[in-house]
Amino acid sequence: MNRKTLFTRYLHNLTEVARRGDAREESFYASLEDLLAQVAQATGRAHVHVTTLPKSTEAGNPDFRLWNGTDSIIGYIEAKNPAQENLDHIEASEQLHRYRWTFPNLILTNFLEFRLYRHGELVDSVLGARPYVLNQLRAAPPLENADKLWDLLERALAESK
């Protein structure tokens, strides 16, 4: 499956969840977990496992853990509800500050925008689709920046060697 098709399917899945009208943040987790697994597979990293709601860490409870399935943590993901259209406020929060400086490879996302941090510093940010279209119009948002989003996710997974 090519990148555009993969991301378009992901956006369609998010839209289906959003249209129900009763979705919480956790309702979107399966779509992201599936996307991450497919990107890992497509980039030759089939050994990467995605754990949703992993056990607590010294810094708190991020929503996802990426790991090799045995002994090596690749990174963590903190997800926020797609209704949280501006991640700047989250980025400045005490919670994310803790995560950024504890986890050397971290993604912050509202399922549409993805921000990659390495050792606490923002190294990449990609808007894959407009939250307004999903949240207000309840329509599948058009895919934007597919190649850049692919590169960000591949870069995050690259820690898996």
Residue ranges and their predicted role:
Residues 1-42, 51-53, 158:
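Charged, often low-complexity linker/regulatory segments
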Residues 22, 34-39, 48, 77-80, ...:
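N-terminal start-of-chain detector that recognizes signal peptides
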Residues 22-28, 37, 65-71, 77-78:
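A broad, low-specificity signal for short, low-complexity segments enriched in glycine/proline
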